[in-house]
Amino acid sequence: MLQPKRRKYRKEQKGRNTGKATRGNAVSFGDFGLKAIGRGRLTARQIEAARRAMTRHIKRGGRIWIRIFPDKPISQKPAEVRMGNGKGNPEYYVAEIQPGKMLYEMDGVTEELAREAFRLAAAKLPLKTAFIVRQLGA
């Protein structure tokens, strides 16, 4: 699963996920892309589950690019622990997703195969997504 190798600080504040993606919002590597329409967080497990679903569907052909990386640690306190006594330990990592962000890209497959693979992947994600075809000349 994806997670940072090392961080300057172990814990991070919650913050607010506002605005829309101004970077990473176009199909750059492949011919087809899965773009986020909604806003939210994707955990490393969700990113991996969607990747597996796509990889299984396209079998040997094609290439997949993951355009997002979970670099924000989410901390949790253990069950049945009283409030206070500091912040909990980092449990997992998430990628903050803004509308317009390209999540995955694919190349080397037909459009209908890519469309179906992205449909299977989108079912694993808690966001609304759209299938994007690379524009010629872009």
Swiss-Prot record:
It holds the Pfam family Ribosomal_L16. One of its GO terms (biological process) is translation. Residues 1-24 are annotated as: Disordered. Residues 1-13 have a biased composition (Basic residues). Transmembrane segments: none annotated. PROSITE patterns: RIBOSOMAL_L16_1. Keywords: Ribonucleoprotein, Ribosomal protein, RNA-binding, rRNA-binding, tRNA-binding. The keyword Cell wall biogenesis/degradation does not apply. It comes from the Bacteria. The keyword Protease does not apply. InterPro entries: Ribosomal_uL16, Ribosomal_uL16_bact-type, Ribosomal_uL16_CS, Ribosomal_uL16_dom, Ribosomal_uL16_sf. One of its GO terms (molecular function) is rRNA binding. GO terms for cellular component: cytosolic large ribosomal subunit. Belongs to the universal ribosomal protein uL16 family. Binds 23S rRNA and is also seen to make contacts with the A and possibly P site tRNAs. PANTHER family: 50S/60S RIBOSOMAL PROTEIN L16, LARGE RIBOSOMAL SUBUNIT PROTEIN UL16M. Part of the 50S ribosomal subunit. This is Large ribosomal subunit protein uL16. It comes from Burkholderia ambifaria (strain MC40-6).
